[in-house]
Amino acid sequence: MLEIQTMEALGNEFIVIDAVSQSVNPDEEPNIIKKCLEQFNFDQLLLIEPPTDKNADLKLKIYNVDGSLAENCINGVRAVALYAFDENLVSENHLLLQLEKSLAKIIKTHDALFSVEMKDFSFAKASCDIANTSKLEFDFEGKTISFEPVAVGNPHAVVFQEIDSEKIPEIGAALQESDIYQKGVNVGFVSVVESNEINLRVVERGVGETLACGSGACAAALCGVKNGLLNSPTKVNFEKGHVLVDV
C-alpha cells in the first residue's frame, strides 16, 4: 500500500509521496492524484524521487490538482525539505533539490525554518511564455488591468494596481484563459503596505486562488524592486503568515 504524508505551509495543503523509500509506478501517477482527491483537499501533490541531475540530492515532481505539472512551488519545496530532513533522506543541513526546470538550494537555519535560494529568473517575455507582440495588459469588465511578467522557474503575472478584492479570483482566471499566455500563468495581486512590506493574493495556474504561494512572493518582490516600488528584503504577507524575500 502506498504511504502518503499530508503537510501544510502557510495554508498551502500538500500531499507528499516519498518515491525514494518506496516504489511508485510513473504510469500510475495520474490515478494516484485522482485517488488522493477523493480523500483529501490539497493544492499540490509533491512526489520526491531520486535525482537525475548528478548535482542534486533529490528530485521533486509537482502535480497540480488538475493533473498538470508545475515547474516550481517554493512552499512545496519548504515542505519537502522538512520531510527530507525529518526522514533522513539527506544527512547535511542543506539540500539541493532538482525541479522541472531549475535547482533549488535549501538551508535549514532552525528546527522548522528554511532558506530557499533560487537563481533562475527572467523578465523576458519569451521566458514567461508570452508572445513578443502581446501587450502587458488586458481588459476585464471594461477596465484595463496592467501586469508585470516574470519567470521564477514558472510563469507569473504581477498586478500592482488597485483591484476590487472580490473580483480577484475572476480577474486571475480571465488572464489565465486569455490568449496572452500560451500555457497559463500564476497571477499575483499586490497591495503595498510600505516600501519593504506587501500583502499578496495569488490565483495559481491549475489550482485557483490559494492561501499562499512562495514563488508568487518571489515574483512580486522581484517586480516591485525592479520598478522601484519596493526595497529588499521584502516581507510578503499571506492570510496565515509571511515569508521574507531577499532579491
Residue ranges and their predicted role:
Residues M1-H110, A157-V247:
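A glycine-rich beta-to-alpha transition motif near the start of alpha/beta enzyme domains, typified by
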